[in-house]
C-alpha cells in the first residue's frame, strides 16, 4: 500500500472510533466491537449502546450467561470464533429481538437445549460450525421461521430427528458437511421447499431414500461427495427440476440407472470422479443438454459407447482421465462443438481414429498423456484451430516417419517447453530423445522394394567404387532389424529378404570439407539381430552430352 493511502486509511479508522470508552480487551468502531483478549472471561457489560455487530475471537470465557447481551437490544450480529464456550445458560440470547446473524464456530459444546434460540425470531443466518455437537433436539429451530441460512458443518452429528427442519420453510442454504451421518430420514428435508443449496459432503452415507429430495423443487446445488454411497435409487433426483450443480465424487458408485439424470434439464455441472463406474449406459446424458462441465476421472471405464455424449452440445469441459479406456469410437465427440478442454490422460489408449477430434474447432486443451500411444494419424488436429495446449508425455512414441505429422504440428502450434518430457521409445537409436527437439530428418521409415531407389551390396560381394543412389522416393513400413553405429549417424534397416533403407549423416573429416568424390568409407553396425560391416562408395563421373 502506498504511504499516502496508508495514512488516509489510518486516519479514517481513527475517525471511526467512538469518543466514549471501549470495553477492556476490545476495539470499538462506529457500529462494531471486536474483542480478542485471551483474558476476557465474560461478555463485557459496557458495550457501547450503538453497537450492531460484536465479534469475539479466542477469548477464554466458557459460559454464556442468561441474557448476556440484554443491555444491547440493537445488536444484529454476534460472532464467537475459536472461543472456549462449552455451556449456554437458559435464555443466553434473550433480549436480542433484532439479531439477524449468529455464529459460534470452533467451540467445544456438546449439545443445545431446545429453547436456546427461542427469542431470536429475526434470525436469518445461524452458523454452528466445527463444534462438538453430537445431537440436536427436534424442536431446536421451532421459533426460527425467518432463517434462510443454516450451517452445521464439522460437528459429530450421527443422526437427525425427522422433524428437525419442520419450521424452516424459508431456508435457502443448509450445510451438514463433515459430520458422521450414516442415514437420512426420508421426510427430513420435505419442509425445505425454498432450499437452494444442500451440502452433505464428507459424511458416512451409504445410501439415500428414494424420496429424500422429493420436495426440494427449488434446489440448485447438491453436494453428496465423499460418502460411502454405492447405489442411487433411480428416481432419487426426479423432482430436482432446478438443479444446476451436482457433486457425487468420492463415493463407491458402481453403476448408474439409465433414468438417474432424466429430470435434470437445467444441470450445468456434474462430478462423478473417484467412483467405481465400469460402464456408462447409452442415453445416460440424453436429458441434460445444459451440461457445461462433466468429470468422470478416476473410475474404471474401459470404453465409452458411441452416442454417450450425443446430446451435450453445450459441454465445455470433459474429464475422462485415470480410467482404463482402451478404445474410443470415431464419433464419440462429434456433437461437442463447444468443447474447450478434453482430458484423456492416464488410460490405456493405443491408437486414435483420424476423425476423433474432427468437430472440436473450439478445443484449446487436450491431454493424451500416460497412455500407450505410439503415433497419431495424419490430419488428426487439422480442424482444431484453437488447440495450443497438448499434453503428450508418458506415451511410448515411435519416432519414425509416421510421427512426422505430429512433430510438424508441435513445431508450428505449441511451445516446445510444453512437451519437454515427451520422449521417443523407439527406434533404438532415438530412444530417450525429446520429441519436440528432434530434427525432422530423423523421423524416417524403411521403404519397400518397389519404392527403393538404390541397391545394397554386402561388403564381401561389393567392390570399392560401387555406385549408390541415396534418393528414397517414399517412406513405408518398418523392418525387422535396424543396424546402427554407436553414434547413431549411420542406420541400415533390413528384413529377412534384403536391406531396404539407409540413412547416413556425414561429418567433415579433419582437414577436409567433407567426403570427397571418388571416395569410400566403412562402418561397423550392430543390432539385436547381429552385426555387419557397411561400405559406402561414391564415384563421380562426368555427365553425358
Swiss-Prot record:
PTM field: Whether or not any Cys residues participate in intrachain bonds is unknown, but they do not form interchain disulfide bonds with the 50 kDa catalytic subunit.
Entry keyword annotation includes Transferase: no
Domain LRRCT: residue ranges: 395-447
Glycosylation sites: 74, 111, 119, 228, 266, 348, 359, 518
Record Gene3D superfamilies: Ribonuclease Inhibitor
Reported function: The 83 kDa subunit binds and stabilizes the catalytic subunit at 37 degrees Celsius and keeps it in circulation. Under some circumstances it may be an allosteric modifier of the catalytic subunit.
Name of this chain's protein: Carboxypeptidase N subunit 2
Organism: Homo sapiens (Human)
